[in-house]
């Protein structure tokens, strides 16, 4: 299959609200020649990254919008526009190859439309984009609801956040403390001809100058390192793990943090890792096996503790709560297409429900770290404020820096917010809570 058609089919599923790129793209990649898979991924992710801008340009060039049933043609047009303005593919090849894919859609009218619109874009597109620059949706390539939400939350930083969201993300590694010191592994990378440097905030983190195939990394198969963003690496040390503790990792997939907990403290009494869907735990199990680690994996709704909790308290809980993922848009640019404003309030409700449900499983004196990869206060500091207001036995702890560094991110009314940095960490939020008393049914705290 032509990589342009494969990318368009994956994007059409996203535009139709039927899938994310993570679920729709692998199916299409299987239909593409191995040598074309990199191009297919670039076309799919690149088009999603710039979709708000490309769709605005398409609207200027089209006489009328596409019908919902023609999402495949719309996606193919966007892929064509992406090639013209954001790739090194020669214009004649971008237009010719994209128009040629129209035959496979079995819509006779599509070929002429695509040819005309793409040629007009080649001639007039740059001028039209300049015309459209006054609209912040076009300028930032973010949907209006998100652009407004970021501006309201971060009036001084919102444009930098958008720019970071549109940049290609760095490849960041986490060194397995059980096998290597970071300085040792940096030397191994140097010997292998891979340029890299130590991360600022994570004492296990290494950022590569250029992404590479994991199979070229020394000791990857042996479990010496994993791929994980620096911001996500901070969770394990924030928990202040000690030997003999029982730890819950709630909403654990794909398991990067689960594994890091076990690397940081090999003498835990056990880790229970819960996720909603059994199929998501497959990846967790694969990561554990590669690293030679063990955890109890449970497929369940973490809120329904009666279904999975054995009644034995946890001394530490990591709640990596489901969220809008607005801090990792650069890694998942289709979030711009799949998320809506209404989702945020619903997610905040879910996050509060998870906190309420898991808090009784935490031992008095135990610690819970709440984490999201969102940059929106509604899902972060506001959720913690509401939880503290209704939970008398909970207190917030300050977040300190690691390895002699100041704490990452920006102090919030509750917790700390990391904003995505070009060439650095993703957007992330952390809050740290301690249980000073149990909660009776009337809501009062009782020590025990």
Curated annotation (Swiss-Prot):
Keywords of the record: Cytoplasm, Methyltransferase, Ribosome biogenesis, RNA-binding, rRNA processing, S-adenosyl-L-methionine, Transferase
Domain of life: Bacteria
Gene Ontology annotations of biological process type: regulation of DNA-templated transcription; rRNA base methylation
Cellular compartments per GO CC: cytosol
SUPFAM superfamilies per the UniProt record, alphabetical: NusB-like, S-adenosyl-L-methionine-dependent methyltransferases
GO molecular function: RNA binding; rRNA (cytosine-C5-)-methyltransferase activity
Primary localization class, coarse: cytoplasm
Active site per the UniProt annotation: 373 (nucleophile)
The protein's Enzyme Commission number: 2.1.1.176
Catalysed reaction, written as an equation: cytidine(967) in 16S rRNA + S-adenosyl-L-methionine = 5-methylcytidine(967) in 16S rRNA + S-adenosyl-L-homocysteine + H(+)
Amino-acid positions noted as binding S-adenosyl-L-methionine in the UniProt annotation, renumbered to this chain: 251-257, 275, 301, 320
Keyword Methyltransferase in annotation: yes
Matches recorded under Pfam families: Methyltr_RsmB-F, NusB, RsmF-B_ferredox
UniProt entry tagged with the keyword Cytoplasm: yes
Regions that span the bilayer: none
Subcellular location: Cytoplasm
Function: Specifically methylates the cytosine at position 967 (m5C967) of 16S rRNA.
Similarity annotation: Belongs to the class I-like SAM-binding methyltransferase superfamily. RsmB/NOP family.
Name of the molecule in the record: Ribosomal RNA small subunit methyltransferase B
Gene: rsmB
């Amino acid at each position: 299959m032509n990589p342009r058609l494969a990318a368009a089919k994956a994007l059409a599923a996203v535009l139709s609200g039927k899938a994310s790129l993570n679920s729709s793209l692998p199916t299409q990649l299987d239909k593409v020649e191995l040598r074309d898979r990199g191009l297919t991924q670039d076309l799919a992710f690149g088009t999603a990254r710039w979709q708000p801008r490309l769709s605005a340009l398409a609207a200027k060039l089209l006489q009328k919008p596409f019908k919902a049933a023609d999402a495949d043609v719309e996606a193919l047009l966007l892929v064509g526009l992406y090639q013209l303005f954001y790739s090194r593919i020669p214009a004649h090849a971008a237009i010719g190859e994209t128009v040629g894919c129209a035959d496979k859609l079995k819509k006779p009218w599509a070929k002429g439309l695509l040819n005309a619109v793409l040629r007009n874009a080649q001639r007039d597109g740059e001028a039209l984009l300049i015309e459209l620059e006054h609209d912040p949706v076009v300028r930032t390539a973010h949907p209006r609801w998100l652009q407004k939400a970021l501006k309201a939350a971060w009036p001084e930083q919102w444009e930098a956040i958008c720019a970071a969201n549109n940049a290609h993300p760095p490849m960041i590694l986490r060194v397995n403390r059980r096998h290597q010191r970071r300085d040792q592994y940096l030397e191994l990378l140097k010997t292998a001809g891979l340029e890299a440097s130590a991360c600022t905030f994570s004492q296990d983190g290494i950022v590569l100058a250029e992404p590479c195939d994991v199979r070229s990394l020394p000791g990857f198969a042996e479990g010496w390192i994993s791929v994980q963003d620096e911001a996500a690496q901070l969770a394990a040390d924030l928990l202040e793990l000690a030997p003999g503790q029982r730890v819950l990792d709630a909403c654990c997939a794909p398991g990067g943090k689960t594994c890091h907990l076990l690397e940081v403290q090999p003498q835990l009494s056990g880790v229970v890792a819960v996720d909603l869907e059994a199929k998501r735990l497959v990846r967790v199990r694969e990561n554990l096996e590669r690293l030679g680690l063990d955890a109890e994996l449970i497929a369940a709704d973490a809120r329904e503790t009666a279904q999975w909790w054995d009644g034995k308290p946890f001394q530490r809980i990591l709640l990596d709560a489901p969220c809008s993922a607005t801090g990792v848009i650069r890694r998942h640019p289709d979030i711009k297409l799949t998320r809506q404003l209404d989702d945020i309030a619903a997610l905040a409700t879910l996050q509060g429900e998870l906190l309420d449900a898991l808090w009784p499983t935490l031992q008095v004196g135990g610690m819970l770290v709440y984490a999201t990869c969102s940059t929106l206060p509604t899902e972060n500091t506001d959720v913690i404020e509401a939880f503290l207001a209704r939970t008398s036995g909970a207190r917030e702890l300050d977040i300190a820096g690691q390895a002699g560094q100041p704490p990452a991110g920006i102090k919030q009314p509750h917790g700390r917010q990391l904003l995505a940095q070009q060439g650095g960490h993703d957007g992330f939020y952390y809050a740290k809570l301690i249980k000073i008393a149990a909660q009776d049914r009337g809501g009062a705290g009782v020590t025990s």
